[in-house]
Amino acid sequence: MKKLKINYLFIGILTLLLAAALWPSIPWFGKTENHIAAIQARGVLRVSTIDSPLTYSVINGKKYGLDYELAQQFANYLGVKLKVTVRQNISQLFDDLDNGNADLLAAGLVYDSARVKNYQPGPMYYSVSQQLVYRVGQYRPRSLATVNENQLTIAPGHVVVNDLQRLKETKFPDLSWKVDDKKGSTTLLEEVISGKLDYTIADSVAISLFQRVHPELAVALDVTDEQPVTWFSRLDDDNTLSAALLDFFNSINEDGSLARIEEKYLGHGDDFDYVDTRSFLRAVDNVLPELEPLFKKYAKEIDWRLLAAISYQESHWDPLATSPTGVRGLMMLTKNTAQSLGLTDRTDAEQSISGGARYLEDMMAKVPETVPEDERIWFALAAYNMGYAHMLDARSLTVKTKGNPDSWTDVKQRLPLLSQKPYYSKLTYGYARGHEAYAYVENIRKYQISLVGYLQEKEKQEAEAMKLAQDYPAVSPEELNKAPFPFLSFLSQSSGYLTHSPSLLFTPQKKEEK
């Protein structure tokens, strides 16, 4: 997958051209029937989306997502509240527009010539390619030539249908596929992982995020080139909503908030290491439970899962870890740092975690107040790794090379230059392994994404198991002995109560008559 970047110049030019074309006919004031006036009179911006890590998700009661944050900012821009409706698939999203149940679709939708015949696109803010995925260990198709409908299923309304149809007509006459009207892309990806489905097609960003939690998901091939992503609204003669969107995107491009949101959700890099991710998730299951209470106890200024990710990057959660340079423990503290924090044993798990958390808080406190709140942690982590003085040099170098020293996107690009003599020889604090600091922060972000997604999925599975237990009371050994299946009777004698197979071992509770 190519590096995702917002084309800011394109947005700016498009904004100016379209705004100039639309402005004379825009009834911003005086008419109550235009889109903007209707939204403001209602006091609510209605946005339909799909539940996914990138677009919109709810974790521990808090809402996240690139499209969600942009939609919330747009609602604030209009001076109204935001109402989000989550749909299962893309077809249902466009139904909301057709039926007048949504003002906007904000769900990582691809700009497509077929779509723009019927719907109004907004500014294009990042790009993706469509990719065919399979499960690691299964047959990997190298071409679409032999893929058929018994193997490939896609979600309804998926933009790739047009591409598949064109490929079938021009290159692969035997290509066929099935559309499952009842399932969304996320469900189909899960079915590929579980082995229920051979292949599906999804966008490259969604796949990249999915792999952080499910490393067994693999990309077989690219079906399309990079395609721009945009929002959609109704297509009619009223251009007020389109003009407001262009003005909004231009403003957040100019003030830097668009770049910050991109960095937050797309800035973790697109390289994927199957072995490393598998090893990390095994450690989450086998090692983290013992350390989790300590991370929760000492993570005061940051999310405990981020502190856990930092520790894994430092030591792979090994309390006895020691580097050739002498740093030791779960948080790999130097002897001098440990002494300054009052620690007596760097290999003691609690001392190391508490000390590392305090040291990180010290680094965050030093980050200039001009750095946006949601990016301060990345500056602090780079300083944690290579020293705060070298972080000051990185900011200074960013200014000298026409970048923004308060933007993590700009500063991280200069970090590798700290080890190059033409640059470090002119800096106050000299040589630093800036490339290592860059990789350090990127790895931590990837581990955090994996940890948050993995734990969220486990919580979901536990909740489903609890519901199953409520609906299906456990069958006792006595009941199993009466069952017409001899192997169930045998199992009942060895395991007391069985709770593995609801279809065989449980009886649904009778619902109380109302």
UniProtKB/Swiss-Prot annotation:
Region (LT domain): 270-514
Cell compartment(s), UniProt: Cell outer membrane
Pfam families documented for this protein: SBP_bac_3, SLT
Keyword annotations of the record: Cell outer membrane, Cell wall biogenesis/degradation, Lyase, Membrane, Signal
EC number: 4.2.2.n1
Family under the similarity heading: In the N-terminal section; belongs to the bacterial solute-binding protein 3 family.
Name this polypeptide is given: Membrane-bound lytic murein transglycosylase F
Organism for this UniProt entry: Salmonella typhimurium (strain LT2 / SGSC1412 / ATCC 700720)
